[in-house]
């Protein structure tokens, strides 16, 4: 379980996050939803360990990780632009992190992930020969072979549309449940958040407006902001 206790963060005297508290269960998919500048990316960076809070704590599996550096947390992120190496093939991108951690995944586990994500026929292609959906799946595979303790996704569907978007959504759910992997998604798209998530966190100007199930968000909005979002 991941627990955030009274997290606050300011920059140059401006409060970006204010007293954020919530708990996320193992294998839950939680979307952080908010408009631009709401603080959702700052919250993602706090969880990842890229920055530290001004106050509050982050507890993961009963361990206080507030001051634990990013590289020791074991949380992995898939960025909005995929951050793939264009000069490498899809396969070499997928196994790139295993160069320094060869025991993290076996060859059979890598093969299973590739099959799960439907990438078998694309392994020898360079990144610029892949579609947006294929790049997203390569980025997911590259992250999953490292066996993250938590999976963080920054706007994973923003560059996709139609059938491809629905396919990636299905695969994210399959991964979270199949690997018992807590998954946190940052998005600005209410439809995306409400259809993929177990819980949705709505942030407005650094404050929690509501944290609940999609049904609660739709049928029991706690503020006019949530109702009109």
Positions of PLM-derived features:
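Conserved ABC ATPase signature
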Residues: 126-130, 134
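A short, proline-enriched helix->beta-strand linker immediately N-terminal to the Walker B motif
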Residues: 145-149
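ABC ATPase NBD coupling module
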Residues: 64-79, 100, 217-221
């Amino acid at each position: 379980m991941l627990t955030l206790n009274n997290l606050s963060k300011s920059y140059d005297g401006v409060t970006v996050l204010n007293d954020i508290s919530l708990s996320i269960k193992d294998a839950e998919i939680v979307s952080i939803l908010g408009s631009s500048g709401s603080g959702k990316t700052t919250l993602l960076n706090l969880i990842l360990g890229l920055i530290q809070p001004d106050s509050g704590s982050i507890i993961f599996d009963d361990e206080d990780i507030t001051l634990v550096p990013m590289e020791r947390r074991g949380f992995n992120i898939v960025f909005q632009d995929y951050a793939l190496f264009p000069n490498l093939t899809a396969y070499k991108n997928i196994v790139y992190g295993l160069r320094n951690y060869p025991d993290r995944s076996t060859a059979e586990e890598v093969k299973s992930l590739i099959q799960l994500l439907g990438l078998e026929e694309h392994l020898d292609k360079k990144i610029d020969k892949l579609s947006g959906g294929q790049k997203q799946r390569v980025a997911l595979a590259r992250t999953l072979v490292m066996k993250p303790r938590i999976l963080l996704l920054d706007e994973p569907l923003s560059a996709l549309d139609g059938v491809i978007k629905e396919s990636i959504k299905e695969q994210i759910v399959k991964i979270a449940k199949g690997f018992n992997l807590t998954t946190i998604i940052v998005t600005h798209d209410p439809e995306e958040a409400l259809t993929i998530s177990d819980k949705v966190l709505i942030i407005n100007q650094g404050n929690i407006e509501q944290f609940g199930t999609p049904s609660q968000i739709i049928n029991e909005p706690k503020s006019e902001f949530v109702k009109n979002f």
